[in-house]
Amino acid sequence: TLFEKHKSLGGMLNQGIPVFRLPRRIIEKEIEQITSLGIKIELNKSVSSSKEIEKLSNNFDAVICAMGTLKPNILNDDFSKNSSVENGLNFLLRVNEKNNHYIGNNVIVIGGGYTAMDCARTALRLGAKSVKAFYRRDQKDLDILPGELEELVNEKGKMIFKARPNTLINKNNTLEFLELIKTKTKKNDKKIVDIFNSKFKIKTDHIILAIGQKQEFKTTKSITNIFHAG
């Protein structure tokens, strides 16, 4: 039995990665191979706590947990509570699975990995007038596929390095600017530090945070028939 929390199989391959980067026919072929094995599938079935997993272990010979890392890293309460700020995975999920194509005019993406690139390029395709991605490290530290940065630039997106988000600037309870700080890498220990008196602001009405994720929960007991596979 396979429990899937979304309305379709495929995980982040299907719900997260944009169609322009991974054609759905490839995923559909793999799903067909799985379903042809006679596996029982329950869609829209969420297993959302360690207690639920432990309960399943009493009803099945073995439980394999392959839920990924979906809990987004956050900056602070100002960012997490602002309705104009959303995390990258939620953004991709609502676009790819829920068909919700809302996008701001001046979009800022924070991050330097696959998700950040996917969010920036998706925002451009949705019609954003301006898309700027900010990464606190240097270009050589990007964790992306070869050619992705060039594709973003060719699509009229921008990538700005050595800058990190600092403060949201609102006007009449509406997001108007993001204040950032320029950064540098210390030579001795490669630590990222702020550059003194280097704050600057960028106009924005929509911020997408793609700064990594972590596991939502894990089993608290050592149970012999529970296995973790990703």
Q: Which sequence ranges carry the predicted segments?
A:
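Rossmann-like dinucleotide/flavin-binding elements
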Residues: T1-F3, E42-S57, K71-N73, N90-P146, ...
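Feature captures the FAD/FMN-dependent oxidoreductase FAD-binding
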Residues: E28-D77, T167-E179, H206-I208, K214-E216
